[in-house]
Protein backbone atom coordinates (compact mmCIF):
# COMPACT_ATOMS: atom_id res chain seq x y z
CA UNK A 1 0.00 0.00 0.00
CA UNK A 2 2.86 2.37 0.87
CA UNK A 3 4.42 1.70 -2.54
CA UNK A 4 1.12 2.51 -4.26
CA UNK A 5 0.72 5.77 -2.33
CA UNK A 6 4.34 6.71 -2.99
CA UNK A 7 3.94 5.98 -6.71
CA UNK A 8 0.82 8.13 -6.83
CA UNK A 9 2.69 11.05 -5.28
CA UNK A 10 5.57 10.57 -7.73
CA UNK A 11 3.16 10.63 -10.68
CA UNK A 12 1.42 13.72 -9.33
CA UNK A 13 4.76 15.41 -8.89
CA UNK A 14 5.84 14.55 -12.42
CA UNK A 15 2.57 15.87 -13.83
CA UNK A 16 2.97 19.11 -11.88
CA UNK A 17 6.55 19.43 -13.11
CA UNK A 18 5.53 18.96 -16.75
CA UNK A 19 2.68 21.43 -16.47
CA UNK A 20 5.02 23.88 -14.78
CA UNK A 21 7.53 23.56 -17.62
CA UNK A 22 4.86 24.26 -20.19
CA UNK A 23 3.34 27.18 -18.31
CA UNK A 24 6.60 28.88 -17.35
CA UNK A 25 6.40 32.20 -19.14
CA UNK A 26 9.02 34.70 -20.23
CA UNK A 27 8.43 38.04 -18.49
CA UNK A 28 6.78 40.84 -20.42
CA UNK A 29 9.18 43.67 -21.22
CA UNK A 30 8.67 46.64 -18.91
CA UNK A 31 7.79 48.93 -21.82
CA UNK A 32 4.83 46.62 -22.57
CA UNK A 33 3.73 46.33 -18.93
CA UNK A 34 3.79 50.10 -18.47
CA UNK A 35 2.02 51.16 -21.67
CA UNK A 36 -0.27 48.35 -22.85
CA UNK A 37 -3.15 46.15 -21.76
CA UNK A 38 -4.20 42.67 -22.85
CA UNK A 39 -6.86 43.12 -25.56
CA UNK A 40 -7.11 39.63 -27.10
CA UNK A 41 -5.95 36.14 -26.17
CA UNK A 42 -6.49 32.44 -26.55
CA UNK A 43 -5.18 30.43 -23.60
CA UNK A 44 -6.43 27.15 -25.12
CA UNK A 45 -7.99 26.25 -21.78
CA UNK A 46 -10.65 24.06 -23.39
CA UNK A 47 -10.83 20.83 -25.39
CA UNK A 48 -11.48 20.09 -29.07
CA UNK A 49 -11.34 22.38 -32.05
CA UNK A 50 -9.84 25.88 -31.68
CA UNK A 51 -12.36 28.58 -30.77
CA UNK A 52 -14.33 29.38 -33.95
CA UNK A 53 -14.91 32.94 -32.78
CA UNK A 54 -11.14 33.51 -32.94
CA UNK A 55 -9.73 31.18 -35.59
CA UNK A 56 -10.39 30.25 -39.18
CA UNK A 57 -8.28 28.21 -41.63
CA UNK A 58 -6.56 28.20 -44.98
CA UNK A 59 -7.64 25.13 -46.93
CA UNK A 60 -6.14 22.93 -49.64
CA UNK A 61 -2.95 23.66 -51.56
CA UNK A 62 -3.18 26.91 -53.49
CA UNK A 63 -0.43 26.51 -56.10
CA UNK A 64 2.04 25.47 -53.40
CA UNK A 65 1.22 28.68 -51.52
CA UNK A 66 3.68 30.53 -53.72
CA UNK A 67 6.65 28.61 -52.27
CA UNK A 68 6.38 25.13 -53.79
CA UNK A 69 5.01 23.64 -50.55
CA UNK A 70 3.45 20.18 -50.83
CA UNK A 71 1.07 19.99 -47.84
CA UNK A 72 -2.70 20.21 -48.16
CA UNK A 73 -4.23 22.28 -45.39
CA UNK A 74 -7.31 21.01 -43.55
CA UNK A 75 -9.27 21.88 -40.41
CA UNK A 76 -9.60 18.24 -39.38
CA UNK A 77 -8.93 17.30 -35.73
CA UNK A 78 -5.99 15.12 -36.73
CA UNK A 79 -4.32 18.29 -38.07
CA UNK A 80 -5.40 20.84 -35.46
CA UNK A 81 -6.72 20.17 -31.97
CA UNK A 82 -6.77 21.61 -28.45
CA UNK A 83 -6.00 19.28 -25.53
CA UNK A 84 -4.56 19.71 -22.03
CA UNK A 85 -4.16 23.46 -22.44
CA UNK A 86 -2.24 23.28 -25.71
CA UNK A 87 -3.25 23.78 -29.34
CA UNK A 88 -1.38 21.29 -31.52
CA UNK A 89 -0.89 21.72 -35.25
CA UNK A 90 0.08 18.38 -36.79
CA UNK A 91 1.57 17.73 -40.21
CA UNK A 92 0.89 14.12 -41.28
CA UNK A 93 2.30 12.04 -44.10
CA UNK A 94 -0.35 9.99 -45.89
CA UNK A 95 0.95 6.43 -45.65
CA UNK A 96 4.25 5.97 -47.46
CA UNK A 97 3.46 8.57 -50.11
CA UNK A 98 4.87 12.06 -50.54
CA UNK A 99 1.46 13.54 -49.74
CA UNK A 100 1.02 15.50 -46.53
CA UNK A 101 -1.78 17.22 -44.67
CA UNK A 102 -1.33 20.01 -42.14
CA UNK A 103 -3.14 23.05 -40.72
CA UNK A 104 -2.82 26.79 -41.13
CA UNK A 105 -4.94 28.60 -38.55
CA UNK A 106 -5.45 32.35 -38.75
CA UNK A 107 -7.39 35.23 -37.22
CA UNK A 108 -8.33 36.74 -40.59
CA UNK A 109 -11.67 38.64 -40.37
CA UNK A 110 -11.85 37.71 -36.66
CA UNK A 111 -8.86 39.43 -35.08
CA UNK A 112 -6.74 42.19 -36.60
CA UNK A 113 -4.34 44.68 -35.06
CA UNK A 114 -2.42 47.76 -36.10
CA UNK A 115 0.48 47.89 -33.71
CA UNK A 116 0.80 46.37 -30.27
CA UNK A 117 2.67 43.47 -28.70
CA UNK A 118 1.72 40.19 -30.33
CA UNK A 119 3.05 37.15 -28.45
CA UNK A 120 2.90 33.40 -29.08
CA UNK A 121 4.34 30.74 -26.77
CA UNK A 122 5.17 27.64 -28.79
CA UNK A 123 7.29 24.52 -29.14
CA UNK A 124 8.46 23.91 -32.71
CA UNK A 125 8.46 20.69 -34.77
CA UNK A 126 11.56 18.66 -35.63
CA UNK A 127 12.39 17.04 -38.94
CA UNK A 128 14.08 17.92 -42.22
CA UNK A 129 11.45 19.29 -44.58
CA UNK A 130 9.34 21.01 -41.91
CA UNK A 131 8.72 24.76 -42.11
CA UNK A 132 6.72 26.13 -39.15
CA UNK A 133 5.86 29.80 -38.98
CA UNK A 134 4.23 32.42 -36.77
CA UNK A 135 3.48 35.41 -38.96
CA UNK A 136 1.17 38.28 -39.89
CA UNK A 137 -0.44 39.42 -43.11
CA UNK A 138 -2.53 42.52 -43.96
CA UNK A 139 -6.28 42.30 -43.48
CA UNK A 140 -6.66 44.43 -46.62
CA UNK A 141 -4.07 45.02 -49.34
CA UNK A 142 -3.86 48.77 -48.83
CA UNK A 143 -0.89 49.17 -51.18
CA UNK A 144 -1.53 46.19 -53.45
CA UNK A 145 -0.64 42.51 -53.55
CA UNK A 146 2.31 40.88 -51.79
CA UNK A 147 4.80 42.21 -50.89
CA UNK A 148 3.53 45.77 -51.38
CA UNK A 149 1.21 45.76 -48.35
CA UNK A 150 3.73 44.04 -46.08
CA UNK A 151 4.36 40.81 -44.20
CA UNK A 152 5.69 40.35 -40.66
CA UNK A 153 7.32 36.99 -39.94
CA UNK A 154 7.40 36.83 -36.15
CA UNK A 155 9.22 33.48 -36.28
CA UNK A 156 10.19 30.93 -38.92
CA UNK A 157 12.19 27.72 -38.57
CA UNK A 158 13.30 25.17 -41.15
CA UNK A 159 13.94 21.61 -40.03
CA UNK A 160 17.25 21.13 -41.81
CA UNK A 161 18.78 23.93 -39.69
CA UNK A 162 17.86 22.75 -36.21
CA UNK A 163 16.98 25.40 -33.60
CA UNK A 164 17.84 28.38 -35.82
CA UNK A 165 14.96 30.86 -35.72
CA UNK A 166 14.34 33.75 -38.08
CA UNK A 167 12.52 37.09 -37.76
CA UNK A 168 11.82 38.92 -41.02
CA UNK A 169 9.76 41.62 -42.72
CA UNK A 170 8.78 41.82 -46.38
CA UNK A 171 7.81 45.02 -48.20
CA UNK A 172 8.04 46.29 -51.77
CA UNK A 173 11.55 47.57 -51.09
CA UNK A 174 12.66 44.73 -48.83
CA UNK A 175 11.70 41.16 -49.76
CA UNK A 176 13.26 37.79 -50.48
CA UNK A 177 12.29 37.80 -54.17
CA UNK A 178 14.85 40.53 -54.79
CA UNK A 179 17.17 39.49 -51.96
CA UNK A 180 16.66 42.63 -49.86
CA UNK A 181 14.50 41.33 -46.99
CA UNK A 182 15.27 42.67 -43.53
CA UNK A 183 15.93 39.72 -41.25
CA UNK A 184 17.91 38.21 -38.43
CA UNK A 185 18.51 34.54 -37.69
CA UNK A 186 20.19 32.90 -34.72
CA UNK A 187 20.26 29.70 -32.70
CA UNK A 188 17.64 29.42 -29.95
CA UNK A 189 18.63 26.34 -27.98
CA UNK A 190 15.81 23.92 -27.36
CA UNK A 191 13.40 25.54 -29.83
CA UNK A 192 12.07 22.09 -30.75
CA UNK A 193 12.23 20.64 -27.23
CA UNK A 194 10.84 23.41 -25.05
CA UNK A 195 8.28 26.19 -25.15
CA UNK A 196 9.60 29.64 -26.04
CA UNK A 197 7.97 33.06 -26.39
CA UNK A 198 7.99 34.70 -29.81
CA UNK A 199 6.68 38.25 -30.09
CA UNK A 200 6.79 41.51 -32.00
CA UNK A 201 6.48 44.97 -30.49
CA UNK A 202 5.02 47.16 -33.23
CA UNK A 203 4.63 50.94 -33.14
CA UNK A 204 4.53 53.62 -35.83
CA UNK A 205 8.31 53.91 -35.49
CA UNK A 206 9.65 50.38 -35.05
CA UNK A 207 8.95 46.66 -35.28
CA UNK A 208 10.95 44.87 -32.59
CA UNK A 209 11.22 41.09 -32.41
CA UNK A 210 11.27 39.86 -28.81
CA UNK A 211 12.17 36.23 -28.07
CA UNK A 212 11.84 35.00 -24.49
CA UNK A 213 11.52 38.58 -23.28
CA UNK A 214 14.76 39.77 -24.94
CA UNK A 215 15.16 41.95 -28.03
CA UNK A 216 16.14 39.80 -31.01
CA UNK A 217 15.96 42.28 -33.92
CA UNK A 218 14.61 45.71 -34.84
CA UNK A 219 13.36 47.29 -38.05
CA UNK A 220 13.04 51.07 -37.96
CA UNK A 221 10.61 53.27 -39.86
CA UNK A 222 12.97 55.71 -41.60
CA UNK A 223 10.14 57.78 -43.05
CA UNK A 224 10.88 56.84 -46.66
CA UNK A 225 7.30 55.94 -47.54
CA UNK A 226 5.08 52.89 -47.85
CA UNK A 227 7.51 51.02 -50.13
CA UNK A 228 9.69 50.49 -47.05
CA UNK A 229 7.07 50.83 -44.30
CA UNK A 230 3.55 49.67 -45.24
CA UNK A 231 2.77 48.89 -41.60
CA UNK A 232 0.14 51.59 -41.10
CA UNK A 233 -2.91 49.33 -41.34
CA UNK A 234 -4.26 46.21 -39.53
CA UNK A 235 -2.71 42.75 -39.84
CA UNK A 236 -3.97 39.32 -38.76
CA UNK A 237 -2.05 36.41 -37.24
CA UNK A 238 -1.20 33.03 -38.84
CA UNK A 239 0.16 29.81 -37.27
CA UNK A 240 1.12 26.90 -39.51
CA UNK A 241 3.43 24.04 -40.44
CA UNK A 242 4.39 23.84 -44.11
CA UNK A 243 6.17 20.85 -45.62
CA UNK A 244 8.84 21.19 -48.29
CA UNK A 245 8.91 24.26 -50.47
CA UNK A 246 11.68 26.45 -51.78
CA UNK A 247 13.13 26.99 -48.32
CA UNK A 248 11.68 24.31 -46.06
CA UNK A 249 12.47 21.65 -48.67
CA UNK A 250 15.89 22.97 -49.63
CA UNK A 251 17.54 19.83 -48.19
CA UNK A 252 14.65 17.54 -49.12
CA UNK A 253 12.08 15.92 -46.84
CA UNK A 254 13.17 13.18 -44.44
CA UNK A 255 11.75 9.95 -45.87
CA UNK A 256 11.42 8.51 -42.36
CA UNK A 257 9.42 11.49 -41.11
CA UNK A 258 5.75 10.61 -40.67
CA UNK A 259 4.52 13.34 -38.35
CA UNK A 260 5.55 16.77 -37.10
CA UNK A 261 3.84 18.90 -34.45
CA UNK A 262 3.89 22.50 -33.29
CA UNK A 263 2.42 23.01 -29.81
CA UNK A 264 1.03 26.44 -28.94
CA UNK A 265 0.56 27.24 -25.25
CA UNK A 266 -1.13 30.59 -25.76
CA UNK A 267 -1.54 33.64 -28.01
CA UNK A 268 -1.78 37.12 -26.45
CA UNK A 269 -2.15 40.59 -27.93
CA UNK A 270 -1.49 43.78 -25.97
CA UNK A 271 -2.24 47.33 -27.07
Predicted regions and their residues:
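GH16 jelly-roll
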Residues: 21-271
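Bacterial Sec-dependent N-terminal signal peptides
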Residues: 1-28
Amino acid sequence: MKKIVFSAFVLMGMASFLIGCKKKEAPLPEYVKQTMNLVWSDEFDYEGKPDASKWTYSMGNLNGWGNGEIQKYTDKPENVNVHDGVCTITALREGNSNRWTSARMKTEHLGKWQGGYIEVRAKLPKGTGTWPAIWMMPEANKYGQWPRSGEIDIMEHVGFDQDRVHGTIHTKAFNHKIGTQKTRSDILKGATKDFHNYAVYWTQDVIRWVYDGETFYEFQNTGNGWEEWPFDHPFYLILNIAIGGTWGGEKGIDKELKKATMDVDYVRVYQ
